[in-house]
Amino acid sequence: MLELLCRVSPARLPWRSCMSLAIQPAQRRRFATEAAGKRTETEKSAFTEWRTVYSMPGIRLVAALSRLKVYQAVITAAGTPIVFALGSAGQLSTDALAIYAAIGVTGLITLTLASYASSNLVGFIYVNEEQDLLKLAYVDFWGRRQETLIETEDLLPSWEQGSPSRLRFVSPICLRSDSKRRYKLLNRFGHVSDRQLFEGLFGN
């Protein structure tokens, strides 16, 4: 047995397989650490008691309006061949197809622009007991409710932002760690339950 081991030259061993065997445990440990960190953060937020700081009752109406463009697109796409067939059969005038398509496309464009305007609109803001972590519940482009956790130290107050918003009733929520990640807050249409804490976090 020893003679067979001595005959095997180390140079003949496939170095790529050796390197892959050495790298795989390190990658597995890194992925396991990242997964454990995500699970820990999720479990921590699940067992944390949250208190509502801000709420906007009309957020459900905004979400429904954002989802309406999907039905508009389906109705326009499905009804166009039917209107065209009826026009070819002489049941409808030739202008009916143009009118139907114009109404459908115009409505779809209007709803899409409204969805872009209401994207990342915050409906609820929660704070934990230690007041060092916020949970934002907002509406995405498709009208679905999304939630994200933000540390209070990562918030950029209004007095530290470069240029104020052109719309006075819209206040942007900016982060120090990611300048491209922004959320929208409606001051006039929302209800603030803790005014002192709200102004301390987001400004006047």
From Swiss-Prot:
Primary location class: mitochondrion
Membrane topology: Multi-pass membrane protein
One cellular component (GO) term of this entry: mitochondrial inner membrane
InterPro entries: Tmem186, TMEM70/TMEM186/TMEM223
Location in or out of the cell: Mitochondrion inner membrane
Domain of life from the UniProt record: Eukaryota
Transmembrane annotation, as ranges: 70-90, 96-116
Mitochondrial matrix domain ranges by topology: 1-69, 117-204
Gene Ontology biological process terms, A to Z: mitochondrial respiratory chain complex I assembly
Mitochondrial intermembrane side, ranges: 91-95
Keywords: Membrane, Mitochondrion, Mitochondrion inner membrane, Transmembrane, Transmembrane helix
Family the entry assigns: Belongs to the TMEM186 family.
Known function: As part of the MCIA complex, required for efficient assembly of the mitochondrial complex I.
Oligomeric and partner information: Associates with mitochondrial complex I assembly intermediates during its biogenesis.
Name of protein: Transmembrane protein 186
Organism: Drosophila melanogaster (Fruit fly)
